[in-house]
Amino acid sequence: MKAGSRRSEASAPLRVAYLFQQFPVRTEVFAISDIAALAAQGHRVTVYTMKGRPRREAELLKVCGVPGALPIDRPSLSDALRWPAALWRWRGPAARLAGQILARSGRYPVAALQALLCLPRAVAIADRAQRFDVVHAFWSRHVGLVLPLLKARRARPVRTAFVGAYDLVADDLLVDLTVGAAEAVVSHAEANQVYIQRKAPPSVPTQIIARGIPLIPLSEEGTRDPFKCITASALVPSKNVEGVIRACAAARAADPRVTLDIFGDGPDRQRLEQFSRLRGFDWVNIRGHISREALFEEMQAASVFLLLSRKPSERLPNVVKEALWAGCSVISSNSEGIEELLPDASYGRIVDPAVPGAAETALQAALSETERGAKKRRAKARALIEDRFSSDRNMSRYVELWRRVLQAPRQVSRSRAARPARSRRGLSRSVRREPRLR
């Protein structure tokens, strides 16, 4: 290949297929940040989902801030009618993958059954994804089955997999099959490095790239309520929102000006409302799910943000990053890897929610912070977020990784069966034969 062609390919916009279980998800707006950052850099992203159209889709797309022009390919009845033809075209790779799934079914019976049921949709996605430069599994779950199918075909797209919270907890055949077929494996916390290095094949590069947040412009300080506390999460028992209410109740006993606003929704909402009502906590306001931008405004008006989650899969929650960028004094549970976000008490406080009084003591200290101390803390926290947790900067790191793999020697088939399927516009793309990536 000529040097000029290499330079052109190295700077050309990438076509990226993003694979999701479902999209969008209210508690995963970081996915939208990734896609928006890629689009802002000139790359073309198409979303493929394993699950069908969500309820109240238009409202969900709006509240999550999904770009209007983003193509989203979901399973549907018309899509399912095309699955038999796709399965026939992919009968070799599909049969091999089914065999791999069945071989592990004794150890993972439920996951194996789910994987077999998802196989037709995975084949349909793989059939369309051949025309892309990159196919990225956002989670190493059922939709990640697309990667071993593409690998078996030696299709052109670079195959990468993210391993995160759900994958670490499941640690099952879906993770093994997805990661085993990836040409690069990414996770978002240094605490996960040992795991992904153990899971990835020896020749496959691994990299830690943090989930980023958009650096929303900041408002002027001076409008912050010094006694306003907030939390934001899915309202499920593992998020321990009751622990936040109890900590604020203890702080309010010392100063009745303390209030708590709770943002989010979920099955635990009714119980939390009843818990507060029975105790006469009229200063607790459960306000439901709001847009990311609206939540950020609330953060900039609050003094303290608390997240006392006990969820085993909690890793560097983006809502904590947003609270730090907004200038809140942050109190977080000691979830794995949280020290990457809160290196010491000058950035925020880490507590063990299982230790009686730990959150209450941290909250009293946060509410007693001087304005000078708060100003210094905000400057340090914002510098950390800008340097390590900007979605624009971190998606540039993804692009660099994808380009490195694209430009490395790879084995790509030129057989008719492995050529990309025609796009909706009738376009196809030729494929080069290259030696295997080492």
Listing of model-derived features with the role each one plays in the protein:
Residues 186, 213, 217-239, 245-250, ...:
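Conserved donor-binding/catalytic core segment of Leloir-type glycosyltransferases
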Residues 296, 314-325, 339-340:
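Short alpha-helical segment that forms part of, or immediately flanks, the ligand-binding pocket
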Residues 191, 212:
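Carbohydrate-associated surface elements
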Residues 270-293:
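Nucleotide-activated donor-binding/catalytic signature segment of Leloir-type glycosyltransferases, i.e.
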Residues 300-314, 328:
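Acidic donor-binding loop of glycosyltransferase active sites
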Residues 344-357, 366-371:
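Conserved acidic donor-binding segment of nucleotide-sugar-dependent glycosyltransferases
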Residues 252, 373-397:
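A short, well-ordered alpha-helix in the C-terminal region of glycosyltransferases
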Residues 289-290, 297-302:
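Short alpha-helical donor nucleotide-sugar binding micro-motif in glycosyltransferases
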